[in-house]
Amino acid sequence: KDDISFVMLGTRSKGAVDPYFHKNIQNATANGVKVGVYIYSLATTTDMAVQEADFVLNLITDYPISYPVAFDMEDSTQGNLSKSELAAIANAFCKRISAAGYYPIIYANENWLNNKLDMSQMIIQYGWQDILPDIPGKIR
């Protein structure tokens, strides 16, 4: 048996429920693997962020989620928004997730965490940073 203690599963792919989401979460829980989830956000307003939170909440309602619900903020559609606008969007998502009894976090790449997002404006102070290895010849 692998020593996998948890997974973070994506919820959306190309605007719809990830086609592998239900199978992945069912297999993980059946094998005693703790589960968290994330959504790659396309939200450019607080209303859109709440809609994304509701999308996630509807998906996970029947599953035992024991790890965070992450809001992945790094899409180019959000790139020209101010730090205050981005914080308001993140806070809207996190408030909705927290109110439903889950633990929200922010997920972003290093550039976004260091230059685009101001964590001091966020209602949560925890982030999850992607760390990609440098692979010669690969564009990332």
Q: Where are the predicted features?
A:
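Second-shell loop/turn segments in exported
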Residues: 11-15, 39-46, 76-85
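Generic detector of short, locally flexible boundary/turn motifs and exposed helical patches
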Residues: 2, 34-37, 71, 89, ...
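N-terminal carbohydrate-binding/catalytic regions of secreted carbohydrate-active enzymes
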Residues: 1-38
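Surface-exposed substrate-engagement region within the catalytic domains
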Residues: 54-69, 76-140
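Aromatic- and acid-rich polysaccharide-binding/catalytic face
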Residues: 31, 43-46, 139-140
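Glycine-rich anion/phosphate-binding loops
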Residues: 19-20, 43-57
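Acidic beta-strand-to-loop metal/phosphate-binding motif
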Residues: 8, 36-40, 69-74, 107-108
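Generic recognition of short, well-ordered alpha-helical segments
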Residues: 19-23, 51, 84-88
